[in-house]
Amino acid sequence: MARNYGFCADHESETVKKTAASKIFDTARDLFYRRGVRAVGVDEIVCEAGVTKPSLYRAFKSKDDLVAACLKESAREGSEAIHAAIAAAGPDPRDRLRAVIRYYADKIGSPDFRGCPMTNVAVELPEPGHPGRAVVEDCKTALRGLTVDLARDLRVTDPEALADGLMLIIEGAIATHHIFGSQGPAQSLTVTCDALIQSHLERRMA
C-alpha cells in the first residue's frame, strides 16, 4: 500500500528539533539498508522520522551526503568489530585471519542480514563521483589491505592471492545469501576459506 506522506508534521517541537538530525540519520540508515538507497526518497525519510524536510537539509546538505554519512558509520562499526575479533583471536596468525572469516560467517547467519551495506551500495551507485561510492571504495580497499597483512603474517608465498581469494569467497557468500539464505552456499564460507588457507600453507612448505 502506498504511504500517504500528507500526514507528516508541518511543525516541529523544540524536542524534535534537538533530536531531528539523529532521528533522520537512524531512520535513513535503516531504510537504506532494508530497501536500498535508490528506492528511498527524502519524503519517506522525514515522514518515518517524524520531522520536516527543512530539518533534513539543515543537518545534511543533500540526500547524497546523508547516504555517505550512513555508510561511514557502517564502515566504522564494521572496522571496530573486525579489529576486536582479530584482537580476541590471540597471537596465532591463522587464528587472526580466521577471525575475519568468522565475523562474516556470523553476520551472514544473523536473521536480519540484508547483505553488506558497502556491496549493496556499490551496485546501486556505479558513478565514481558519488560521495557514497567513495566511502564504499575506501572501506573495501581498507578491508583488502587488512586481509593482505593478515595473510602476510602466515608467511605464505603469495599473500595477495590468498587475501583476494578469501575476499572472493566472502563476497560470494554474501551475494548468494540474497537468493538462498544462510542455509545455501553461504554456509560453506568457513570451510571453503579454511581449505584455501591450507592450500597456501602447503604450497609454502612444498
Tell me the role of every PLM-derived stretch:
Residues 1-19, 201-206:
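N-terminal intrinsically disordered/low-complexity leader segments
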Residues 69, 83-112, 153, 159, ...:
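Hydrophobic alpha-helical connector segments
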Residues 72-79:
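Short, basic, alpha-helical segments at the C-terminal edge of helix-turn-helix-like DNA-binding modules
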Residues 131-141, 152-206:
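Hydrophobic/aromatic-rich alpha-helical bundle segments in the mid-to-C-terminal region
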